[in-house]
Amino acid sequence: APWLVPSQITTCCGYNPGTMCPSCMCTNTC
């Protein structure tokens, strides 16, 4: 189900940090 797929920011900063994008995206330091 689509709503079970984590958003990019959630995947970065939530369940799997750094998996989908740089960790700087979590702190707006990119």
From Swiss-Prot:
Keywords: Disulfide bond, Glycoprotein, Hydroxylation, Ion channel impairing toxin, Neurotoxin, Presynaptic neurotoxin, Secreted, Toxin, Voltage-gated sodium channel impairing toxin. It comes from the Eukaryota. GO terms for cellular component: extracellular region; host cell presynaptic membrane. Glycans are attached at residue 7. The modification 4-hydroxyproline is found at residues 2, 17, 22. Expressed by the venom duct. O-glycosylated at Ser-7 by a core type 9 glycan, containing both D- and L-galactose units (alpha-L-Galp-(1->4)-alpha-D- GlcpNAc-(1->6)-[alpha-L-Galp-(1->2)-bets-D-Galp-(1->3)-]alpha-D-GalpNAc-(1->O)). It is found in: Secreted. Its main location: secreted. GO terms for molecular function: sodium channel regulator activity; toxin activity. Disulfide bonds join 12-21, 13-26, 24-30. Found in both injectable (milked) (IV) and dissected venom (DV). May specifically activate neuronal voltage-gated sodium channels (Nav) at the resting membrane potential. Causes a marked contraction and extension of the caudal and dorsal fins in fish and noticeable spontaneous contractions of isolated frog neuromuscular preparations. The cysteine framework is IV (CC-C-C-C-C). This is Conotoxin CcTx.
